[in-house]
Amino acid sequence: MKVNRILIYSLLLAGITITSCKDDNPSIDDYWLNYEIEEVKVTQDIPVGVYLYNPQNALETNVDQWTRITEEQDVAAGKLGPNTKPWYDLPEALEAGKYHLAADTIGARAMQKIIEWCHYGRIDFMVLPGINENANDIYPLNIGRDTAFIDMVRGLNDTLPKVELNGVKFALMVNMNSMCSDLNNNKLVENVDPTRKTYPVIETIPDINNPGMDIVVTTRVDTLIKRSDRICSYFKRISDYFSDPNYYHTGGRPVVVIADANKLYTQDSYRMYTAIRDTVRKHTGKEMYLIAQQGAWTPPERFHYFYLSGKVDAVTMKNMCAVGGAQYERVILFDQFVNENYKYNKEVFWSRYNIDFIPSASPGYSQYVATENNSNYPWMPKTQERFWTMCNVAKMNLGTNPMVLIDSFNDWAFDSCIEPTDPSYGKGY
């Protein structure tokens, strides 16, 4: 009997020990990032926008960058370019395949091809390259030469081949840094020195030497303009394009993307953004839908005193494939990390600020074209599979006003583009 009791106790102890070991051992099944990004079926139309870049200057004049785009890929030798050629099939081009997109004849034909591709890909609108302020003039001359490119896209430049948008809309992106580059924590928009501007005033007055006749007189007026008024005037000029029938609206509101929104240092962000909205509303009768661009992998709370307190309508992330310098750990479970990042940002924006989230999707990222020897940034080679996965991550994190922004159509400097290439050359698609 005693032997039986010992045997029973031994078996019980062994069972407990085995069970305890099984419970204590970690399982990969329990790991919070152990999941796959599944294909997301959509049940409604999701508006899709795409960023249009204007990188032609570097690609036309920088032979090294063009070589790094077109040369054969050799990972062992550190040659990480896409081995492709941007492709327009334009007979006017001086060199086949050379990139060109500007307000001229070749640029207009290239723009028409881009629109055809956007239409084929069912892209709803293009976000045009960021518009800079012209600090030397006042409204309506305060955005300078950017008007030539915008008018070309709109098909309103009579000196160029007419561009037809064919149902593809456009939206504008403002470059906040062009007005706020000198601002910081100790130099706010409210206390920075006003800008001295001289502008012409044209008047018609009686000609004292010829009774009954008039003469036109131009007078130069010297004035001081507060920085906050400059910013409002800049948005007023941007809003002149809202009446274009091809300008993209959501819910009846014109969409404006704000690049470098974190450069607007102000004592009261809400008051500053309210002044901007009031200026545009008074000028156009429209309420803007403002989308602030946030840097990839940055925490939302960092921008509390900027556009979040300013109550923009939505926030979007820049290219998440740009994982940052030496951030190699983000590459290992990249898809899951992006998804968790989006989930967190979306929840914070909505629950704390009542601001919507607009996910972005990118096909890849590489520093190689822009800076050949910069190995500090992990290489995220552009692939169709990555782009599909990022689109599914975006669909998993749609906001209350569903929309997705693709970064980008043609940012060749960082090989993060979906623009078609010459299919007969290298790894063309």
Residue spans of the language-model regions?
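N-terminal secretory signal peptides that target proteins for export/translocation
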Residues: 1-3
